[in-house]
Structure formats: structure tokens, C-alpha cells
Amino acid sequence: MYQPLADRLRPNSIDEVVGQRHILGEQGVLRRIIQGGNIPNLIFYGPSGTGKTTVAEIAAAQMHRPFHRLNATTASLADIKAITADVGTLLAPEGVVLYLDEIQYFNKKQQQSLLEFMEDGRITLIASTTENPFFAVFGAVLSRSTVFEFKQITAEDALPAVER
């Protein structure tokens, strides 16, 4: 089966992630949260190609919960309800991790619909956006999430990955 190069080279651990030392370095807050395994709702923002999706996948793996990925440009509330259908069963007794890419494309009502699932623990939301979340994300979702900024990757950051 064909697998894109980016997926074949995607890091599997925090130590393999390129850049983002300010949050993933040895004393980085996000590193500590992920290593702790009890991950809150998170919002990642920054330019494309900075590792937001990769870090979300690594975080979800630490939680040992089912991981679902949706893109807000094409997803609907029905998709979210379908994902939460197995919560509480043997398939997902402790809830699921939902990675919602491009959350800024969900309108206010769609973002509000996430609250019920976030508050009762059916979903641990990890959302990403290229927009400033303080303008693009509904306030109630934002207040229930921890926000991290991902910065552009520099040539210096990329060198260790190229050498690998």
C-alpha cells in the first residue's frame, strides 16, 4: 500500500520532533504534559508544516485511547457523534482523543457542540489552527483548553532530522 513520504518519516516520539524546543525541549511544558499521560484539551496554532499533527498523534499514543482525526473543512457534528458512539464500551471505556485540524473552519455553533463531549470526558480535544486561536476559536472551547504556539522550523532545527 502506498504511504506518503511524510508519513513514512513522521516522528514517533517527542525526541524525534523537529523544532519546537520552546515547548518540547527537556524542560518544555508540553513535553511534561505528554510524558505525564494525563493530557488536557489542547489547541496548537502556528504555520503549516510545524509538527502540530505529529505532536497530536504522539500525545494520543501516550494516553492509550482511540485516536480519531477530522478536518474541520469537511467534518460535521454527525462525524463527532459517530466517534463518541463507542465511548463507555469496551472499545473506548475512557473516552477518545479527537484531533480536529483547522478548527477555525468550524462555525460557532459547531464549536459549541464540542463542549458537551469535552466536559463529560467523552472527547479529549486536540485541535490545530493556522489562525490566532484567541480570535478563531469560540471562547468556551478556548477556556477549556491549553494553548501552545508552534513556531516556523529553521534550517538549524531541521539539520538533525536530515542527518537521521
Describe the predicted segments one by one.
Residues 1-36:
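A short, basic N-terminal segment
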Residues 1-3, 32-70, 85-88, 115-120:
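Walker A/P-loop
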Residues 15, 42, 148:
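Conserved beta-strand position immediately N-terminal to the Walker
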Residues 23-27, 65-97, 108:
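Short glycine-rich substrate-engagement loop in P-loop NTPases that contacts/grips substrate
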Residues 31-35, 109-143:
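Conserved catalytic/switch belt of AAA+ P-loop NTPases
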Residues 70, 99, 124-128, 149:
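Structural recognition of the conserved hydrophobic beta-strand(s) that form the central parallel beta-sheet
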Residues 71-73, 146-159:
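Conserved AAA+ ATPase "SRH/arginine-finger" region at the nucleotide-binding site
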Residues 98-100, 114:
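Walker B beta-strand of ABC/ABC-like P-loop ATPase nucleotide-binding domains
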